[in-house]
């Protein structure tokens, strides 16, 4: 789980997403509304498509996925992987006592599994 992650907002321009993608090394992002609630996500696939098609002039609100999933820090990794696959999400929020404590994304999980296999 990553406890340090970028919070993008509905009104952000997609160029902001691309900048964070390249500078921060994050691949998938959660999107928040003005009240701090999670509104959606932007998976790496969307970012790559936007770069390829040169459609960065849109807002995050126009380009995000509304598919969301939430897990607990106590959930088993295999359960999280199955949930992500079933729900079609690349990033999940991790909450404890109704508080967002981090995120897990496909890239984090794949890196962890590769390291564990070595």
Describe the function of each predicted region.
Residues 30-31, 36, 43:
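Well-ordered, non-transmembrane segments within structured domains
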Residues 1-5, 15, 43, 56-68:
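Bateman (tandem CBS) regulatory domains
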Residues 38-41, 100-103:
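Glycine-rich acetyl-CoA-binding "A-motif" of GNAT/NAT acetyltransferases
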Residues 7-26, 32-33, 51, 70-89, ...:
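The conserved cystathionine-beta-synthase
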Residues 34, 55-56, 63, 96:
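Short, functionally important structural connectors and interaction interfaces within domains
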Residues 40, 46, 64-69, 79, ...:
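Low-complexity, flexible helical/coil segments
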Residues 12, 25, 40, 45-61:
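Cytosolic, membrane-proximal regulatory domains of ion/volume homeostasis and mechanosensation machinery
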